[in-house]
């Protein structure tokens, strides 16, 4: 006889929760700086490489989206089921350098869409040098906390605002990564 609205049957130990991930990639002018002096890769090149590596960790049960931003944001790839990784890589690799830096609207856009996604885990990854706008992210952080969406940051380049990006990641229950060369590129999901 059922007493509580709880299923007490154990789930399969092989069941993996679905993931919705939106990568928010900075393509502002400051991202054209040399990020890796050895290889000559720019900060944008490093961000694209990190995003590509994150895609490789996704499964067909997952969802992915890509938002790019400079002084405005654009959906490079609307949130979609991971079916063709080559198409996802093409969308990421087609990101070109742009203008100024306005991070907050891109983070808000990512949050507004990811909350609509039917996935068990919802996670946003911000790939940026953090340069360009004010440092008051309290309302953005609170929006992420209220929605239950986690946000990790990847500080790209030696001139990145590491303190700001650590604060954002910590406030949104995410992880912080630092990357200044292609060799030590963080594997965001391992």
What are these regions (language model features)?
Residues 2-190:
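Exposed acidic/Ser/Thr-rich ligand/metal-binding surfaces
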């Amino acid at each position: 006889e059922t007493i509580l609205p709880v299923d007490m049957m154990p789930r399969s130990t092989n069941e993996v929760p679905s993931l919705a991930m939106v990568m928010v990639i900075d393509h502002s002018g400051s991202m054209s700086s040399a990020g890796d002096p050895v290889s000559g890769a720019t900060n944008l090149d490093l961000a694209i490489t990190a995003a590509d590596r994150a895609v490789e960790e996704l499964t067909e049960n997952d969802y992915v989206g890509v938002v790019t931003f400079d002084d405005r944001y654009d959906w490079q790839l609307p949130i979609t089921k991971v079916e063709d990784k080559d198409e996802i890589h093409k969308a990421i690799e087609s990101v070109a350098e742009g203008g100024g830096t306005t991070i907050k609207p891109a983070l808000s856009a990512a949050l507004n869409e990811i909350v609509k996604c039917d996935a068990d885990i919802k996670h946003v990854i911000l790939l940026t040098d953090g340069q360009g706008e004010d440092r008051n992210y309290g309302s953005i952080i609170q929006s992420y906390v209220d929605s239950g969406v986690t946000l990790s940051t990847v500080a790209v380049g030696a001139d990145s605002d590491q303190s700001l990006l650590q604060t954002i990641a910590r406030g949104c229950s995410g992880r912080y990564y630092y990357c200044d060369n292609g060799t030590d590129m963080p594997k965001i999901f391992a």
